[in-house]
């Protein structure tokens, strides 16, 4: 991938320091082994608590079998890395600062257009969310990635003998640079800076559907593990996927419906781990374990 002038100029000072931090953190933490079976709370376990919230992450930590906290990141107008899935504030579960609902008449509230000081006023946890009726309702704010990591690391230190792992998604799209997010290189640089500052790089996988993000990570931050997300419509073989990417990712994370025993064997033969998403029944979780997947992502960490 051709590297942008952005990295050479404005980000030129950030990237060398970030890369050094990654290497130092990784070298210092070589004893941190990736979980044999990575059991991941999707968006913190949104079946039980408001998605992407600090409360959800802490609840997931309370389940002994959960090894990994899965989450998504966006960038605000003032370049804060925040933990949220959607490009816009979702009317299905977000309330305005005054407690009223976002209506169809309201202008769409795009994360990338908002300052964090304004974004944090919205409540993402009090409104009943019919897709996840078991979700515990409470006033919840969108967290900065740095603050969420501080909270989860402190909580895990109290509750666990071993630290948590993280699976963090770059929510970029190939045709949306400058619309839903900054240039993908800047997006990744901002995320990696937080991860290295918080000294969790050795315990973090960065994932994305966007092959540009995965390729940039592989080239600019080779010490960080990457996961390539693929959806249910993906038809390429494992070999074709590797060829299209141009390198072998640490993980391929497919929609669980396309995972077969043969697919897992092909990935393992290529040295790739398989961690499917999003698996929300006990029966399907056990079926996937039976075909030797390397992890499972679920909205319901209580099912593990």
Regions found by a protein language model. Name each.
Residues 1-32:
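Bacterial Sec-dependent N-terminal signal peptides
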């Amino acid at each position: 991938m051709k590297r942008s002038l952005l990295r050479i100029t404005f980000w030129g000072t950030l990237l060398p320091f970030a890369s050094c931090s990654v290497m130092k953190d990784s070298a210092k933490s070589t004893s941190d082994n990736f979980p044999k079976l990575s059991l991941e709370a999707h968006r913190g376990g949104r079946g039980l608590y408001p998605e992407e919230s600090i409360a959800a992450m802490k609840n997931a930590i309370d389940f002994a079998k959960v090894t990994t906290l899965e989450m998504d990141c966006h960038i605000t107008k003032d370049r804060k890395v925040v933990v949220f899935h959607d490009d816009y504030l979702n009317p299905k579960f977000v309330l305005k600062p005054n407690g009223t609902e976002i209506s169809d008449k309201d202008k769409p509230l795009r994360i990338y257009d908002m300052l964090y000081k304004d974004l944090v006023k919205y409540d993402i946890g009090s409104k009943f969310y019919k897709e996840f009726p078991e979700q515990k309702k409470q006033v919840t704010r969108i967290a900065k990635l740095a603050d969420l990591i501080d909270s989860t690391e402190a909580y895990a230190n109290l509750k666990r003998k071993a630290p948590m792992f993280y699976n963090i998604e770059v929510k970029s799209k190939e045709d949306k640079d400058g619309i839903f997010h900054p240039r993908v290189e800047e997006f990744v640089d901002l995320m990696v800076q937080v991860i290295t500052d918080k000294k969790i790089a050795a315990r973090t996988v960065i994932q994305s559907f966007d092959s540009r993000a995965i390729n940039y990570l592989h080239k600019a931050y080779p010490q960080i593990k990457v996961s390539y997300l693929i959806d249910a419509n993906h038809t390429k073989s494992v070999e074709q996927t590797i060829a299209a990417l141009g390198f072998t990712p640490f993980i391929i994370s497919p929609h669980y419906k396309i995972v077969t025993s043969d697919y897992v064997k092909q990935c393992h033969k290529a040295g790739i781990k398989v961690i499917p998403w999003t698996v929300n029944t006990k029966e399907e979780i056990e079926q996937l374990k039976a075909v030797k997947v390397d992890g499972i992502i679920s909205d319901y960490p209580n099912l593990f």
